Amino acid sequence: MLLDKLSVLSFLGLAPIFAAAQLSGSVGPLTSASTKAATKTCNVLDYGAKADKSTDLGAPLASAFADCKSGGLVYVPSGDYALSTWARLSGGEAWALQIDGIIYRTGTDGGNMIYIEHSSDFELFSSTSEGAMQGLGYEFHADDNWSGPRLLRLYEVTDFSVHDFILVDSPSFHFSLDTCTNGEIYNMAIRGGNHGGLDGIDVWSNNIWVHDVEVTNKDECVTVKSPSKNILIESIYCNWSGGCGMGSFGSDTNVSDITYRNIYTWSSNNMMLIKSNGGSGFVENVLLENFIGHGNAYSLDIDSYWASMSAVDGDGVQLSNITVKNWKGTEAYGAERGPVKVVCADGAPCYDITIEDFAMWTEEGDSQWYSCESAYGSGYCLQDSDDHVSYSVTTSTVSSAPSGYSATSMAADLTTDFGSTVSIPIPTIPTSFYPGATPYSALMANSASTAAASSIASHATVHSSSASVAASVPSAVAPSESIPAATSAVVSSAAAIAPSPAVGAQEGSTTSAPSFAAPSGAGNSPQGPTGASGFGEKGQQGEQGEQGEQGEQGVCYV
């Protein structure tokens, strides 16, 4: 249903907040969804959509967008909808997409089920916090097919937010942010199959804030790819996932000013994986702060010879100024996979790596190891020298637990995975993503005036040492009285595809990374890649690496 708290939440939609200086400026839409809805509302039911779980939503969604793309709100009411032809929504400005219903995949083409491109001042949300896309990926996976469609992709979108939305069981990746700017992603739940190639959120963009998100899968939780700059990722709940990371990185890697903060990881492949194998370029200014982990195969895993991707030409990606700070918890078996692994390229030794306030201990056995190669800095096995020459792997083993390693667990930690060949239920969005941390924004479903007011207060006090940036907060909307007439949709049998990120050979063809202009006020931070190894090192085959995308059949677009 469309909510009715316009005055308070419309104000909230433009409320300034203090977010970490890792961002270079404001994030989120420039106008509230309520303002857009008051301008014009395009209800898909008035364009031929039916909430019967069989009538294709593709053409009605494209037609509604065509009428509201220059300013307005496209509305998908509560109910069950089928999507058999994918929706490509191109060129919108000052518009919003409110999905309160559940969209079920019924088509079988590749590509992206919903593809938003070349848009500005955009917001995608569910006013009930129950809107979802159900990809029914198990129907592909039961036939050992891992290259089906992705659920949601944004390409060249600026000043935007996606929030209060659920993505379930994608046949391939769940959510990609491709060459976007000034975006905020929050209050989301993503639940995928227990297999590689089913990424949660992949980001290769500039000035993006991702926070308060839960991911279940067995590949990327929230991952930064190249090129990326000024990315703040915090309050992430990797609940039986692959884990957070950066990469895979190949040729011309260009990644800087990345912060991961308040990351909770349970029963995953790793807490943080920075992965590459050969290649060139750089990753610099990364902060990995306040991590809690339990039951994970790896903890900190920096691997410049990552075996799950084919080697790329080049001496290696240069890693520098990476700070790992305040990590607590336990790993599954420290004698087999130690909590600190920093393996850098012999042709490009990493430097200015700092590991401090790091206390992890093994759940099985009574020892664990720390391993470094061609890595310089301070802490554990890192070598302290200004002469950054390559050196062989050095490993130290300890048999006593470090002080202060004990860390709390989350009550919602899953007790088993969801497999990959049976239907996965649609979850609810949690209200807690990291122990002791309050989400920055209340769920829209819970955002009565009192909750909204408290959200303003929490936004005003987020990082006292940070720069002020504007960010979007849930804004309720109401439809305008007049409903436009339906327009015809255009159905394409083959749509052109946006470029892919620069990645390693296993993730599709490598592209050159554009250089971002250095933003003013950008803080320094260390960074790292993602991936999934451990737990049998399974499921990372090819990572479906942003490849293919040609010949997307059956795309509804305007």
Curated annotation (Swiss-Prot):
Disulfide partners: C42-C68, C221-C238, C344-C350, C372-C381
Family under the similarity heading: Belongs to the glycosyl hydrolase 28 family.
Organism: Aspergillus niger (strain ATCC MYA-4892 / CBS 513.88 / FGSC A1513)
Annotated catalytic residues: D219 (proton donor), H294
Region annotation (Disordered) ranges: 503-558
Entry function: Pectinolytic enzymes consist of four classes of enzymes: pectine lyase, polygalacturonase, pectin methylesterase and rhamnogalacturonase. Hydrolyzes alpha-D-galacturonopyranosyl-(1,2)-alpha-L-rhamnopyranosyl linkages in the backbone of the hairy regions of pectins.
Reaction equation(s) it catalyzes: Endohydrolysis of alpha-D-GalA-(1->2)-alpha-L-Rha glycosidic bond in the rhamnogalacturonan I backbone with initial inversion of anomeric configuration releasing oligosaccharides with beta-D-GalA at the reducing end
Subcellular location: Secreted
InterPro entries reported in the protein's UniProt record: Glyco_hydro_28, Pectin_lyas_fold, Pectin_lyase_fold/virulence
Positions annotated as glycosylated: N145, N239, N254, N321
One GO MF term attached to the UniProt entry: polygalacturonase activity
Name listed for the protein in its UniProt record: Probable rhamnogalacturonase B
Glycoprotein listed as a keyword: yes
GO cellular component term of the entry, any: extracellular region
UniProt signal peptide: 1-21
Superkingdom assignment: Eukaryota
Pfam families for this protein: Glyco_hydro_28
Gene3D superfamilies reported for this sequence: Single-stranded right-handed beta-helix, Pectin lyase-like
Main enzyme class: hydrolase
Low complexity bias spans: 503-526
